[in-house]
Amino acid sequence: MNQIGFKNFRRFKELQPKDLGDITILVGANNAGKSTLVKGLLLILDNLRTLKIGGDSPIFQQPEFRFDANDYHDLGIGTFGRALFNKASKDMISFAVRLTRDLNLMDDSGNTFKRKADFSILIGVTGDKSTDQTTGTISRIWVSDNNRGIKFDFDY
C-alpha cells in the first residue's frame, strides 16, 4: 500500500492521502492521530481481506464493512458510531488507498516481462451512529487502474 487517506474517520474530518514507504515512521504529539492512521490502515486491509458479500455478485448486494474484531486484529473501534468523526456533517466514512506493485509476468509464448500495477481504491461506508452497529454498509466502491485509465464505480 503506497497511500492512505480518509474522511470522517475517528479524529479526522479529512486526511489527505499520505505516502507510505517500505518503512514509515509516525512521529507526533499525543492525540495527533498516529494511532488513528494505523487503525485506518489495518481496518482497510482487514476488510479488503475478509469482505463478505451476500449472493453471487457484488453488483446486486451491498457489502458490509466491519468495525469490530476479526480474525486478524481487534482495533478497539467496535462500532460505526465510534469510528465516525464526532463532528461529521453526514454519517459516511470514506477510505482511500493507492496500491502499486512491480509485477513479473509471462506471455503466451513464455516470454517474461515487467509491468507496474497501479490502482486507486475508494470505499464509502454509511451507518447509524446512534446504535451499537458493528458494521457499516458499503455505499460505494470506486477502483481505478491508473495505468490503463479504466475506472469501475459501484454505487449501491
Show the residue positions of the predicted features.
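P-loop NTPase switch/coupling surface
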Residues: 1-156
